[in-house]
Amino acid sequence: QLLQFAADVATGMHYLSDKQFIHRDLAARNVLVGDNLVAKIADFGLSRGEEVYVKKTMGRLPVRWMAIESLNYSVYTTKSDVWSFGVLLWEIVSLGGTPYCGMTCAELYEKLPQGYRMEQPRNCDDEVYELMRQCWRDRPYERPPFSQISVQLNRMQEARKAYVNMALFENFTYAGIDATAEEA
């Protein structure tokens, strides 16, 4: 079901990109699950109906979901939404983990252009992580289009392979939490 959520979002983003809309805030917090467990993209507050958008005003931005070119040059395209999709896919697989946990925004500005990327979640299949890595390529034109991402995720769904190992996830969900904390 987790990969189906990702496939639903990719299909929705393919539609938006065909209409030349840039979402600019694609994240798990902006995906709603509706009837029949269909994931739908929400919160279009930062979206723009342009092929390329250059931000020229100040304001709060979702830094942990932003592509390198958006962080460095305030340039947003469908390919920067693809980067954000890779982060969203990481969120789905990690069952709501915080992207770049423990890193400051300043560290992201410094490390992402140097090639740093989030590690593969322990419960994540190599093929899913490779898709994330494709979304996080330095050069926007090297990132896959949403049409390709959608096809890839649907193909994975049809393979009926365990791309997210829930048994492994249970082994580290609460690691490092003091058992006596519940009693306090």
From Swiss-Prot:
GO term, biological process aspect, one: vasculature development
Compartmental location: Cell membrane
Listed GO MF terms: ATP binding; transmembrane receptor protein tyrosine kinase activity
Protein name per Swiss-Prot or TrEMBL: Tyrosine-protein kinase receptor Tie-1
One Pfam match: PK_Tyr_Ser-Thr
Any single Gene Ontology cellular-component annotation: plasma membrane
Database matches in InterPro entries: Kinase-like_dom_sf (IPR011009), Prot_kinase_dom (IPR000719), RTK (IPR050122), Ser-Thr/Tyr_kinase_cat_dom (IPR001245), Tyr_kinase_AS (IPR008266), Tyr_kinase_cat_dom (IPR020635)
Residues with PTM Phosphotyrosine: Y53
Principal location: membrane
Keyword Protease: no
Quaternary structure annotation from Swiss-Prot or TrEMBL: Interacts with svep1.
Reported tissue expression: Expressed in most populations of endothelial cells in 24 hours embryos, including the endocardium.
Mutant phenotype after disruption: Increase in the number of apln expressing endothelial cells in intersegmental vessels at 48 hpf. In a decreased flow model, there is an increase in gaps in the dorsal longitudinal anastomotic vessel with fewer lumenized segments at 2 dpf. Significant reduction of parachordal lymphoblasts at 2 dpf and loss of brain lymphatic endothelial cells at 3 dpf. Increased apoptosis and reduced directional migration of parachordal lymphoblasts both dorsally and ventrally along the arterial intersegmental vessel from 2.5 to 3.5 dpf.
PANTHER family to which the protein is assigned, alphabetical: TYROSINE-PROTEIN KINASE RECEPTOR (PTHR24416), TYROSINE-PROTEIN KINASE RECEPTOR TIE-1 (PTHR24416:SF341)
The family this protein is said to belong to: Belongs to the protein kinase superfamily. Tyr protein kinase family. Tie subfamily.
Protein source organism: Danio rerio
Entry EC number(s): 2.7.10.1
Occurrences of domain Protein kinase (ranges): 1-164
Keywords: Angiogenesis, ATP-binding, Cell membrane, Kinase, Membrane, Nucleotide-binding, Phosphoprotein, Receptor, Transferase, Transmembrane, Tyrosine-protein kinase
Tree of life domain: Eukaryota
Entry annotation: catalytic residues: D25
Annotated catalysed reactions: L-tyrosyl-[protein] + ATP = O-phospho-L-tyrosyl-[protein] + ADP + H(+)
Function: Transmembrane tyrosine-protein kinase. Required for the formation of facial lymphatic structures and brain lymphatic endothelial cells. Also required for embryonic ventral and dorsal migration of parachordal lymphoblasts along the arterial intersegmental vessel. Plays a role in the embryonic formation of the dorsal longitudinal anastomotic vessel.
